[in-house]
UniProtKB/Swiss-Prot annotation:
It is an enzyme of class 4 (lyase). Its cofactor is [4Fe-4S] cluster. This is Aconitate hydratase A. Pathway: Carbohydrate metabolism; tricarboxylic acid cycle; isocitrate from oxaloacetate: step 2/2; Organic acid metabolism; propanoate degradation. The gene is acnA.
Amino acid sequence: MPTVHNSEYIKELLVDNTSYKIYDINKAASDIGISLNKLPYSLRVLLENVLRTSGNKENLLVFKEWLKTKKSNTEIDFMPARVLMQDFTGVPAIVDLAAMRDAMQKIGCNPLKINPLIPVDLVIDHSVSVDSYGLKESFEQNVQMEMKRNIERYQFLKWGQQAFNNFKVVPPGTGICHQVNLEYLSKVVWYNDGTAYPDSLVGTDSHTTMVNGLSVLGWGVGGIEAEAAMLGQPLTMIIPEVIGVKLTGKLEGMATATDLVLTITEMLRRTKVVGKFVEFFGYGLSNLTISDRATISNMSPEYGATCGFFPIDQETIKYLEITGRETRQIKLVEKYATEQNLWYNFEDTQEYTEVLELDLSTVYSSLAGPKRPQDRVNLSFVESNFKNELPYFALENQDIDKKYAVANQNYEIGNGDVVIAAITSCTNTSNPSVMIGAALLAKKALEHGLNVKPWVKTSLAPGSKVVTEYLKISGLDKYLDALGFNLVGYGCTTCIGNSGSLNPEIENTINKNRLVVASVLSGNRNFEGRINPLTKASYLASPILVVAYALSGTLNIDLTTTPIGANIYLKDIWPSQKEIDAVIANSINPSMFIEKYADVFNGTKEWHDLHITTGTNYNWDKNSTYINNPPYFDNICSENTIKDIKSAKILAIFGDSITTDHISPAGSISKNSPAAKYLIEHNIEPLNFNSYGSRRGNHEVMMRGTFANIRIKNEMCNGVEGGFTINQLSGVQQTIYDAAMDYQAHDIPLVVFAGKEYGSGSSRDWAAKGPGLLGIKAIIAESFERIHRSNLVGMGILPLTFTGNNTRLSLKLDGSETIDIIGLSKNIRPFNLVKCVIKKQTNEISTIDLILQIFTENEINYIKHGSIMQFVVESLKG
């Protein structure tokens, strides 16, 4: 039985003759001398969590402190109700748990102590690629290819399901984890052992935040933090600043929820909300469905916030009803939220660190690109935006308007042509309004004699089977099929870079003529090199605009003033909101959700037929190139101290906005990369390389793939793209991996310098694990993104920031310097100042201050133990 804390706050909640115990946050707030109505709704959820899980009532006083200054420097322990994972991040997490069991056995402890104590759901959604498209058979063909490529990984996950308690796997071909979470897994109010409490979670994908649109507090963490949470370790955090966004008015004209989230992303990136909660309030909430809100919450990582929270209201109840949740559960949510002052009240006087305001009627039809999700562009300016960005792509001495013939085809392509148009990602496919809007636009386009341009690769990959069901019931699926937007899979596909190959003749034309072609997708990220290696420009857009750009085939058009064809303008085929709402009313009902999720954990015959080994500990195959026992626990009993870094060399110097995609790419493995060399040495043909993301269970592949993004630029190698550096031992340009191994052989520690927003993007912990295995001891940057900073600490790597006006540029670093970081071996505390001594080859020495970006005492312990994983094993072995 779990330990009961603060029992004097337990009271009974009666819902239809069922009695639940709840922790009364109204009484708790009164006892510490605050008005609960002044606390943001997201912090009320945190207050309940601390009240229910903390043994020290004094911990509640931090909320009183927060109300005084609207910020806090005091840490709390957060205990999520559950954990959500996807397979790219989930496989390495289960590998780590399996390795922990071996480590426990090695030191004479019970390996079964390594077991999730809270529910863990893993949804396999990241592995399907768009190999086949434009055919009615595409879905089946892609599923077969997925199973063939990933059989070893899936066998491992099935082993994990039988080996670990509280661990369930949603098989491939079912949906995207965040949409499955929204439509099925989330309860809004959880109950266990007779106690009801707010649903909450952390997930190993940064877009876990999507569920905040359903009033479930949650955010993305690295796999190593998620592992700790599974094993009962609290997630230590400082109560964040909360930015209130007051919404007024309603969307008008052609504006969609996608346009709204791109507008919010642009606005909040400028406001700088990294590490902060964002909470939406105001009368505008009544004009946003849960699907609209989920779209906004999904892109929290893109605007930098820990989460984008919407409080419970009548829309929450309507969504639970339409998605087929049990009546008992819905009544519990309504009664609990009302009793605990978690139900949104327009008259509440909640206070925020800062308040921003957005009138929904000012939102215009938009895209974002060509390489960052915060770079919103009005639809009417996309053509000029793309042309203005062309110089960035280094098109010197080229006729940018020239068209080039495609072999064996009767068309030409040029710069700005759209070669990928993908309706993809849970960000938008979870929203019936934009999905039905896209289908209606397809219908009208066909009725006006329009068609998709032949050079455009089209695909439809929704986040759940419910989407294809309502498209089928509405009769609109046939119009999308007719334009080539056939179902290719239920998974992330193009949004995460699994866009598949283009037509070989098109690829040859692009490469031969160095064309800057584009992808337009309904996803949430468009970082360089992410969507497809050949689409240097990528624009995020609503599914409706994805179809529109597939029809135009180019960015070199103003769709607001120029006809798409034969005097047909976009406005002529754009569906009205009234048309969309009518289809929704006639095509979506609770029974389809109940039916499609009835067998969500069952899977296909191919899944059932997977042969697996059983047992407590995993039987590692030393020859496997997918699953390998990692070396994190080789020195499990080593001395737990922090030492100064002496005589370190600089492995790389990076600019601003280095993403986790740059650090640890998820996409295809280049044939000339260190990872490819390793795979070839292990008799893997290039055709079977699969992706970096699929091989995250093998540290040998992943450390070789660290900083291997084809678009990354190390400032030590002027003008060179890709994962290269100058090895200071030889003076030779090498791959970053090869240079790092040379430094390791000489026992030389490494550091990396960078600019602003280092580690933005996905939550992938391999962006910290990889650098750790390369021997990097510290990253020195102007600023870090939230999740990546936590991941670095979790792997024992020091995140350090400059003080004053110092930057890598002001210091005039060229990479030949030797670095000492002094002051670590003393009694270090969070946010300590440490000294960085920079020794140039000219013997010139300078010393600067750096700020240790370690937030809590727990994080100090992770650094001392070498990683959060070693800390957990040490904690459990007693």
